């Protein structure tokens, strides 16, 4: 069962994590061939071709998110694709600024006159590979902006940051529309391999897409914006990037908060994810059993979740698809990764914890009854 939990949790993580791992593996294979182009000297030399300038752009999500002029702004930062190589091409990275704004309820008697702090927050996004727009939605009304500007840098290779697999999810939907989990996994892997092959054919240097370069990009943005120091906040993969950034730019960091910390050792998060998921389920179950209402309503939700995952592993969920453009066969299949992945993703937000036992019990109940009609909403 630990294997199934690991697979479910890993599948719930973003495509970018796999993309980055495969890209770095590909890059490692050609390391000898790159030595002639390698930058040598001190660490400062790695920024020898950075211009530390930004250009203002209209935010790509304008018209899709509601905000007033002056609340959110966007820009591009030009950086070398691979700072390890002297002849690397330049790429542009997208960043978003969420401007500090005085809260409607500001207690001047207790907190003094409102004034914006000059030490902003840089939020390190997750994945790797999560686009900035999701974080803009999440933080545009967040209390962290009460006195500080917040910056979000879209990691290289995704979104508006020179996406090297644009429209990745739109190609050939029939390939992954299969009824066997193993075939689905093979199709997903083949799509990633095709993405990398196409990127390389267009001259993309995959060796430049890694956590070290991401950390250097964060320093480059800080210097381009003219801040001596800022406050660093990273969650999930952002905690890996945060650890790398601590080593990269210690003098540029005023304070750092890393949440849901993942080891910086390559691959360690996937090796441990099943154990961590199991620990979270155990803690959730313990809390439920200590609450009379929860104990009466959902006393065995963890056992039922695992049984549901086992059932779906043997017999995948099959439903009639609503959108036949996305599911050309007219059918859609779901596997145990979605049964375990739904509560796994829900664990990211503490606000979900009180309802999680009931949610898991309801999800397991659907599987127990073979009542899969609700899954059509995902098609």
What are these regions (language model features)?
Residues 1-4:
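Positively charged n-region of N-terminal signal peptides that target proteins for export
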Residues 7-17:
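Bacterial N-terminal signal peptides
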Residues 25-32:
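Long, low-complexity intrinsically disordered segments that are proline/alanine-rich
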Residues 368-379:
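Small-residue-rich helix-loop
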Residues 34-338:
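Gly/Pro-rich cap/lid or specificity-loop segments adjacent to the active site
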Residues 304, 308-311, 359-362, 377-378:
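Charge-rich, solvent-exposed alpha-helical interaction surfaces
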Residues 19-25:
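Boundary at the C-terminal end of the N-terminal hydrophobic targeting segment
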Residues 331-364:
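P-loop NTPase catalytic cores that bind/hydrolyze ATP
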